[in-house]
From Swiss-Prot:
Lineage of source species: Bacteria, Pseudomonadati, Pseudomonadota, Gammaproteobacteria, Enterobacterales
Protein's UniProt keywords contain ATP-binding: yes
Family note: Belongs to the fructosamine kinase family.
Active site: 193
Alphabetized UniProt keyword annotations: ATP-binding, Kinase, Nucleotide-binding, Transferase
EC number assigned by the record: 2.7.1.-
Binding site for ATP: 91-93
Purpose: Ketoamine kinase that phosphorylates ketoamines on the third carbon of the sugar moiety to generate ketoamine 3-phosphate. Its precise substrate are unknown: does not have ribulosamine and/or erythrulosamine 3-kinase activity in vitro.
Gene that this sequence comes from: yniA
Protein name: Probable ketoamine kinase YniA
GO MF annotations in UniProt: ATP binding; kinase activity
Length: 286
């Protein structure tokens, strides 16, 4: 794998050699390395060869976010595979937690991301993943249909396959669709998994990574913030300073949070199952 990475980097940086290769802690999904090649520092994710499509999708999403020129993301240098392993090579940006100032700036940047480009439909040109969960993104013109079916219904079906039952799937999907029926927002490019673990302060300001992008309601990104008390509230303040949210957005917030709560429940079980069921019960009773 390292020979393949060196070859791809040499095509962009000229001949060099690997000067440093340290495995990083916390690689819960993929192995992660800090690599120095020809004086440049890189962050390398690697896994089994069969997982190359996931790395390709992640690279495509980072490049899509970069094209918006609104947010900072790690530059992608290489994505590929050898006989045994697949890998994704990006800039190495030593992460620090966001402070109040950088959180405010990030909020402004996210607001501008949501304003970028015109897209008439909801979805994405390819499917991707929320953490390790496959995420479908088939294009759909009605937001209520897209979110009810491809977000909530999809999570409920995956849970059912694992033996986890939250209720009648068709009835829940219909309820969610009705809750959103009168809400048809302008599609915005979303990060899709905007929690504190995917935001950091780098050498040149805040940056985001590990996206789960799609074109959706901008409120979905903001709905993540209250789920993470460690996320600085200034992100929300910065966002509001550029693109104020509608007065009724809090009515939809628990609907959008349910997607993440169901995903956590299926992945981690335990108390997450209780939290997701309670959230769903409150929505159905409203």
């Amino acid at each position: 794998m390292w020979q393949a990475i060196s070859r791809l980097l040499s095509e962009q940086l000229g001949e060099g050699e690997i000067e440093l290769r340290n495995e990083l802690p916390g690689g819960e999904v993929h192995a992660a390395w800090h690599l120095r090649y020809a004086g440049h520092d890189f962050f390398v994710k690697c896994d089994e060869r069969e997982l190359l499509p996931g790395f390709t999708a992640e690279a495509d999403q980072l490049e899509l976010l970069s094209r918006s020129k609104t947010v900072t993301v790690p530059k992608v240098w290489a994505v590929g595979a050898d006989r045994d392993y697949s890998f994704l090579v990006m800039d190495y940006l030593p992460p620090r937690p966001l402070d109040a100032h950088s959180a405010f700036i990030l909020g402004q940047q996210i607001a501008r991301l949501h304003q970028w480009s015109d897209q008439p439909q909801f979805g994405l040109d390819f499917d991707n993943a929320l953490s390790t969960t496959p995420q479908p993104n088939t294009w759909q013109r009605r937001w209520s249909t897209f979110f009810a079916e491809q977000r909530i219904g999809w999570q409920l079906e995956l849970a059912a396959e694992k033996g986890i039952a939250f209720g009648n799937i068709d009835a829940i999907v219909e309820h969610i669709q009705q809750r959103l029926a009168s809400h048809q927002p302008q599609p915005s490019l979303l990060h899709g998994d905007l929690w504190s673990g995917n935001c950091a302060l780098g050498p040149d300001g805040p940056y985001i990574f590990d996206p789960a992008c799609y074109w959706g309601d901008r409120e979905c990104d903001l709905a993540m913030l209250p789920l993470h008390t460690e996320q600085p509230p200034q992100i929300y303040d910065g966002y509001q300073s550029v693109s104020p949210l509608p007065a009724d957005f809090l009515e939809r917030q628990p609907v959008y949070q349910l997607y993440t709560l169901l995903n956590r429940a299926r992945l981690f079980g335990g108390q997450h199952l209780v939290i997701a069921q309670q959230s769903l019960d409150r929505l159905l009773a409203a």
